[in-house]
Amino acid sequence: MKQVDIKLLDPRLQDVFPGYATPGSAGLDLRACIDERMEIHPGETLLIPSGIAIHLADPGFAAMVLPRSGLGHKHGIVLGNLVGLIDSDYQGQILVSCWNRGQAGFTLDPMERIAQLVIVPVVQAGFNVVENFQPSQRGEQGFGSTGKC
């Protein structure tokens, strides 16, 4: 298991330390470390503090902030940047950009679970500038070229 340094910036997280819900969970929940209930109006995007900072330190890893499926499907609450990417050398608080793409306001309570954090491997590639690529079966065929969407 990869060990990650974490700072708990909000003392309330001592009671609900970020962790994995099940042995098969890929992501751990991020919570809304806000002091009082707030409304996210339709079309509005707000930055919500998570109360944690992490330092991955290893350039072979990054963290991704992803939406919670239930919030998006049931309430229209998704990430304003769709996916948040946390680089291995970032050490600041993780902020969650919450966008209400729904038709109704959404009430966010303090310490509510709002997103998930997934640690992923990263490959930093070197690039060779070429004039042409070796032919492949797909070539330059793009959107929808491999079958019905």
From Swiss-Prot:
Record-level GO BP terms: dUMP biosynthetic process; dUTP catabolic process
EC number: 3.6.1.23
InterPro entries reported in the protein's UniProt record: dUTPase (IPR008181), dUTPase-like (IPR029054), dUTPase-like_sf (IPR036157), dUTPase_trimeric (IPR033704)
PANTHER family: DEOXYURIDINE 5'-TRIPHOSPHATE NUCLEOTIDOHYDROLASE
Pathway involvement of the protein, from the record: Pyrimidine metabolism; dUMP biosynthesis; dUMP from dCTP (dUTP route): step 2/2
GO molecular function list: dUTP diphosphatase activity; magnesium ion binding
Protein family per UniProt: Belongs to the dUTPase family.
Originating species: Nitrosomonas europaea (strain ATCC 19718 / CIP 103999 / KCTC 2705 / NBRC 14298)
Source organism, top-level taxon: Bacteria
Catalyzed reactions: dUTP + H2O = dUMP + diphosphate + H(+)
Protein keywords: Hydrolase, Magnesium, Metal-binding, Nucleotide metabolism
Role according to the record: This enzyme is involved in nucleotide metabolism: it produces dUMP, the immediate precursor of thymidine nucleotides and it decreases the intracellular concentration of dUTP so that uracil cannot be incorporated into DNA.
Cited CDD domains: trimeric_dUTPase
Protein name: Deoxyuridine 5'-triphosphate nucleotidohydrolase
